[in-house]
Amino acid sequence: TAASETKLIKGFGETVKELKEKGIGLYIVSGSIIEGIELVLGENVKYFDKIIANHFVFDKKGVISRINATKYDYEGKSVFASELIKKLDISPKELCFIGNGDNDEWVYKTGCRTICINPDGADFSNTVKWSRCIQQSDDFRDLLPIIESLEEENERE
């Protein structure tokens, strides 16, 4: 399957573990299928507070009968971010959203920090939509200094 052939970017597990150990909440909001996401994440799934995505619904014979679509794709990602900001009672700038596609670009409307990594359809040069951008990376750990610099900006503001 496509999910079983998908590999995580180098440094992914180390990065999410480090962020979690720092007390940072981690969420995945995706237009992909949750079963595939969980398969690709493997043991790293434990670091995420919540994963929201489309999911398969199976009939009694175990055949996929339909897909339950998440309401949190495209503009819905912005809705999710707004709901999370309210639920956690944080400033929008305390939320950092990481994405790479045009379906991720809506989140900037919440006022949260946004990082585009390995853009795939995203207008990564748009500094209104993206606080920071890593145009090409083969190591997820490249995000750590950027996240740290955003935290430092928050402390100064």
Each model region followed by its residue ranges:
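Conserved Lys-Pro-Asp/Glu-containing loop-to-beta segment of HAD-superfamily phosphomonoesterases
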Residues: 75-105
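Short, acidic/turn-prone active-site loops that include or flank metal/cofactor-
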Residues: 53-58, 118-124, 138-141
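A polyampholytic, Gly/Pro-enriched intrinsically disordered region
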Residues: 67-80, 137-142, 150-157
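Substrate-recognition element of Asp-dependent hydrolases with the DxDx(T/V) motif
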Residues: 12-41, 49-55
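Acidic, Mg2+-coordinating phosphoryl-transfer loop and its flanking beta/alpha structural elements
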Residues: 30-31, 94-135
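Short, charged, surface-exposed secondary-structure boundary motifs
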Residues: 59-64, 124-132, 143-148
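Histidine/lysine/aspartate-rich catalytic loop segments that bind and position anionic ligands
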Residues: 45-72
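Metal-dependent phosphoesterase signature
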Residues: 1-11
